[in-house]
Amino acid sequence: MRKIRLISIITILVLVLATIPVFAGCGKVAAYADPATENILIAMNDGDYASFSKDFDDTMKSELSEDAFPDFVASVNGQVGDYIADSKDFKGFNTSNGITTTEYMIDFEAMEDVALEVIFQKIDGKMMVVGLWFN
């Protein structure tokens, strides 16, 4: 009986210790992803391309250029309204081959719980946005 209890305690302790790095990683990712993501969404509301693209890498800036920005914003906000500031809920992330995919649920004026993925990559020592998808 005592042996079974000791094994149970050890098992629980191992599981708790194994989750610590996961939660620590979550905090590190959210520390750069949350402000960058909020900035992108608020800049869309404001029609401010300079703010919208400030964390984009060069490829992302060329693919979603200042000329294309108004049409992009219209395609999103035209369907769901403006983003509701600070409504994003960080759901998690996945890192593979130096690319970190963050997942959020966000609210707009006309629709709640819209899925958003923001993709980051470290470039020249800074985490840059290399992808952005609304689902």
Protein language model features and the residues they cover:
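Absolute protein N-terminus
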Residues: M1, G25-V29, N135
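Sec-dependent N-terminal signal peptides of Gram-positive bacterial secreted proteins and lipoproteins
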Residues: K3-C26
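A general boundary/transition motif marking the beginning of the first structured unit of a protein
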Residues: K28, I40-L41, M60, L64, ...
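Residue-level signal for cytosolic alpha-helical hairpin/rod architecture
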Residues: D34-T37, S53, D113
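Exposed beta-sheet edge and beta->alpha loop/turn motif
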Residues: S87-N135
